[in-house]
Design a protein with these regions (language model features):
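Signal for well-folded cores of large energy- and translation-related assemblies
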Residues: 24, 35, 78-85, 89, ...
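Acidic (E/D-rich), amphipathic helical modules within compact regulatory domains
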Residues: 29-78, 82
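Extended intrinsically disordered, low-complexity coil regions enriched in Ser, Thr, Gly, Ala
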Residues: 37-42, 121-127, 146-147, 151-153, ...
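Extended, positively charged loop/linker patches that create polyanion-binding surfaces
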Residues: 59-142
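Short, surface-exposed charged micro-motifs
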Residues: 18-20, 45-47, 100-102, 131
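Mixed-charge, glycine-accented linear interaction segment located at domain edges/termini
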Residues: 135-167
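N-terminal, positively charged regions that mediate nucleic acid binding
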Residues: 1-42
Length: 179
């Protein structure tokens, strides 16, 4: 590899003002105004160092594979920092043809009632610190960890999927929620 390509093997991420980042072994802890989260980098071949206001990532090899892993790691850390500052929101729409679907939240479960006229309700899990609020024909999912918010939305969508019939689907995709 030429020297120009090896210069790309180190990337810096600027830490936002009100975010605290610390590294304990291979575990990166990120804390902000909306909450705290962590990511384990044990099996990811990237060297992480935290300076005053920057996180420095360095690839452990010079091949294209390591460059791809470096950029993926940068994206993961940027997502963690954005989440604890702005949060993430997904808006889902309840669509039905005859039987009105009702959505209720009980603890860490989302109950989908009267789906296709079924007497039993369908149950979806709420992941970690994600909040689900049903409002009329909309279900709004918010949280500070992107994977938890999207996984909660995916479970609700999969539990209400029947071919060519009623469903609950994502009407507005994930984007950072601005405070």
């Amino acid at each position: 590899m030429s020297t120009k390509q090896t210069e790309k093997m180190e990337v810096g991420i600027v830490i936002p003002e009100n975010v605290k980042v610390r590294l304990a072994g291979h575990m990166l802890h990120v804390e902000g105004p909306l909450g705290k989260t962590h990511k384990n980098f044990k099996k990811i071949p990237v060297d992480i160092q935290i300076n005053d206001d920057k996180i420095m990532l360095k690839a452990l090899g010079e091949r294209k594979k390591y460059y791809a892993i470096l950029n993926t790691s940068r994206s993961l850390i940027q997502t963690l920092c954005d989440g604890v500052v702005n949060g993430y929101t997904i808006k889902m729409k309840i669509v039905y043809s005859h039987f009105p679907i009702t959505v209720k939240v009980e603890g860490k479960k989302v109950l989908i009632e009267n789906f296709q006229g079924e007497r039993a309700y369908r149950v979806s899990n709420i992941w970690n610190d994600t909040k689900v609020t049903p409002k009329g024909d909309d279900v709004i999912i918010t949280g500070h960890v992107l994977t938890d918010v999207t996984q909660t939305a995916a479970e609700i969508e999969l539990n209400s999927r029947v071919k060519n019939l009623s469903l609950i689907h994502i009407s507005e995709p994930t984007r950072p929620r601005l405070i």
